[in-house]
């Protein structure tokens, strides 16, 4: 159930964003300069489209991917597919072989069991990074959500060598009780 007292929920409704998550990307982009006008952005786990909407409004061309349907957005091409399957990567590459930014706010179905939810979030983040390694341009940027837990440092260490700048970040728009953090990787290098 949506928290009807949630400031960002109401702000998103008032300002026409598809979800409160739009403010997370806006805040991260303001801090880290992830998306520039003219960039080609790949949004994995995109539905309902808050991040795709922000990227398009920033002047990027966006390819959005999700297992669930998404209502159309201007300057956004949608692919319905599972990011863990190779055929989805093929569809992504049919549109473009390389992208300036790969981002993922994908979240697993929450079971209520912390360890399971954490591990599922790491699996989704790894699937996102697996795609990013294939399509992200050298010098490109990568953002992915993970839930904090015992595997987070191992995951960070896996990504670390691929980026000149890397850190975990929790935007102000994240709920205070949320265990989500975002890995920010800038200036990608293929190794």
Swiss-Prot record:
Its main location: cytoplasm. It holds the Pfam family FtsJ. It comes from the Archaea. One of its GO terms (molecular function) is rRNA (uridine-2'-O-)-methyltransferase activity. Its EC number is 2.1.1.166. Specifically methylates the uridine in position 2552 of 23S rRNA at the 2'-O position of the ribose in the fully assembled 50S ribosomal subunit. This is Ribosomal RNA large subunit methyltransferase E.
């Amino acid at each position: 159930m949506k928290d009807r007292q949630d400031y960002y929920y109401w702000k998103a409704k008032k300002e026409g964003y598809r979800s409160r998550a739009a403010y997370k990307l806006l805040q991260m982009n303001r801090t880290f300069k992830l998306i520039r006008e003219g960039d080609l952005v790949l949004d994995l786990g995109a539905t309902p489209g808050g991040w795709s909407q922000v990227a398009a409004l920033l002047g990027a061309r966006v390819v959005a991917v999700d297992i669930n349907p998404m209502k159309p957005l201007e300057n956004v091409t949608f692919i319905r597919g599972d990011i863990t399957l190779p055929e989805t990567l093929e569809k992504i590459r049919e549109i473009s072989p390389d992208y300036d930014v790969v981002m993922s706010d994908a979240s697993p179905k929450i079971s209520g069991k912390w360890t399971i939810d954490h591990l599922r979030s790491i699996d989704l983040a790894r699937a996102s990074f697996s795609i990013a390694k294939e399509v992200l341009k050298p010098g490109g940027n990568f953002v992915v959500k993970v839930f904090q837990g015992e595997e987070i440092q191992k995951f960070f260490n896996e990504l670390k060598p691929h980026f000149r700048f890397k850190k975990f970040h929790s935007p102000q728009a994240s709920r205070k009780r949320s265990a989500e953090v975002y890995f920010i990787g800038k200036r990608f290098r293929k190794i």
